[in-house]
C-alpha cells in the first residue's frame, strides 16, 4: 500500500509541475546588445521607453545606476538604452542620425513604437528633449511620441553658461574650475556668448525660459525630475539654489504651464539621489521607477 501511495504522490507532483509552470524562456525578456544600444524586449509589449545616459556614461551605466529599465520591461515596456552621449546640444545631422538608429532598432527587432516615451539623465535629458522636438516636427516620424522626461538636466544653456562663469569666480572648490572652463569654451565655440548670440541659444538649446523655446512642446506630456538638496550642493560645490539645474528646470516648467501645457510636471524628490553608491542628488535614482512606469502606462492607453 505504501508503494501505491508513493506512486500517486509522484504522479500528482509531476502533473502539477507540467501544467502550472510556464517555461522560463517564454517569460524572460530578450536582450540585444549592440555597439550603439542595448534593447530589452518583453514577450508581450505595450510601450517603448528610450533612455539616454549622462555625459560620460553608456547603456550599461544607465542599467546599473537605476531600476527604471528592469522595472519597465517587467511591466511589458520595451526599453532601448542608447550609448549616445557627450552632448548637451546636437546638430540637425546628429539628431537625424540618432533618430535613424532608433528607427533601425525598431524595424530590425520588431518593436512596437506606437507608444514611445523618451527620457534621459543629465545631458541625456538634453538629448531627449532635442530629439522629442525633432520627432514632433518630422512629417513621417519613426516612433509615435507620447511623452518625454529629463532627470536633473542642464536644459537651459544660457543658465549653464552663467553658472559656469560664477564657478570660475569662486575661491572655493578649485577642482571644478576645469569643468567650468570647458563648458564656457565649448559654448563660446559652438554658439558664442549668450550676450552676443542670443538667437543661437534660442535655436540650439534644448529649452530656455522663453515662450519661443518651449512652444514646440506645449502639447506634449513632459516631466522634469530634480532633487534640489541645497544643503548638499552648498557643502560640496558652494552652489546656491539659483545655480542648480532645479532652478532652471522650474522656470522652464512654469513657462510651459503658462503656454497652456497642463501635462507638464515638475517633480522634486528628497533623499533619493545615489550615484555609484554614494549620496548625490544628481543621479538617475531620484526617479521613482514604479511611478514612472505607471505614467508611461497611462500615456499608452
Residue ranges of model-derived segments:
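Short substrate-entry loop that stabilizes the transition state in hydrolases
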Residues: 46, 51-90
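C-terminal motif of bacterial Sec signal peptides marking the signal peptidase cleavage site
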Residues: 16-17
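C-terminal catalytic histidine-bearing segment of alpha/beta-hydrolase fold enzymes
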Residues: 90, 223-232, 246-301
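N-terminal cap/lid segment of alpha/beta-hydrolase-fold proteins
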Residues: 20-44
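Proline/glycine-enriched tight loop/beta-turn segments at coil->beta junctions
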Residues: 41-48, 217-219
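Mobile cap/lid helix-loop segments that gate and shape the active-site cleft of serine hydrolases
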Residues: 56, 163-215
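Primarily recognizes the serine-hydrolase "nucleophile elbow" in alpha/beta-hydrolase
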Residues: 107-108, 114-171
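Alpha/beta-hydrolase active-site loop
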Residues: 90-109
